[in-house]
Amino acid sequence: RHKMDLWNRIDFVLDTNKKESPVLAAGETVRGSRFKQGAGGKGFNQGVAAHKAGGNVSMVTKLGRDALGQVALEAMDAVGMKKDFLFYSEDVETGVALILVDEHASQNEIVVVPGACATLSDDDLAAVEDEIKNSAYLVLQLEINQDANEKAARIAKKNGVKVILNTAPYQPVSDEFLNGLFLVTPNEVEAEEMTGVKVDSLEAADGAAAVFFKKGVQNVLITLGGRGVYVNTDGA
């Protein structure tokens, strides 16, 4: 069976040499040390990883007809990804993200402009419905429009497909959407936003996981930056 991702944007990464918090003050300018551009996004990165690990991956996204959309296509070609479920917007640009990386603290800040991938339509979802039904996993994230996420998740749940949600970039989601998800993968900030529990210890992570379980999530994975990863499968 297939694994399916809904994804895409292009990432611009700027390393800074700022030694204190990477958060910039109003009007502040800092000197960067390196800049690079490449295809990325939560779904794209996860899909490529699964593909390289031998998975049968179907990528679904919407691109603009622009130079950045071409970057995404070339990146897919470079790793041999299938392009059967790509859609195009004639009037909205390809999604992008600007990532500021503090090279000393190994922390980053990200501004996401979803662009075309936030315009997936009912017609687009109808075109991939059979592919979702025949998948083993559906991997979603919050860069695409939430109505597309919810419709895709309903199709998956109805057909016994396990749904994994990467909760970035954070936006509020309904308890109905969370109910029945196989796995959620927030970071500490997103976990707090979604549960009201500040994840500053393993005990607090237990508390956040308990809230997710009450909402019907089966498994919880919280990324903790330099401290590693918290995993709890008690809801399964």
Features from the language model and the residues they span:
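Glycine-rich phosphate/adenosyl-contacting loop at the front of the ribokinase-like
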Residues: 1-62, 67-78
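Short beta-strand scaffold segments in enzyme catalytic cores
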Residues: 48, 96-100, 109, 228-232
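Glycine- and other small-residue-rich loops at beta-strand/loop junctions that grip anionic moieties
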Residues: 61, 140-142, 166
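A glycine-rich helix N-cap at a beta->alpha junction
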Residues: 75-91
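Short gly/ser/thr-rich secondary-structure transition/capping motifs
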Residues: 80, 118-123, 163-169
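Conserved phosphate-binding/catalytic loop of the ribokinase/pfkB sugar-kinase fold
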Residues: 84, 88-89, 99-137
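Conserved phosphate/ATP/ADP-binding segment of small-molecule kinases
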Residues: 150-235
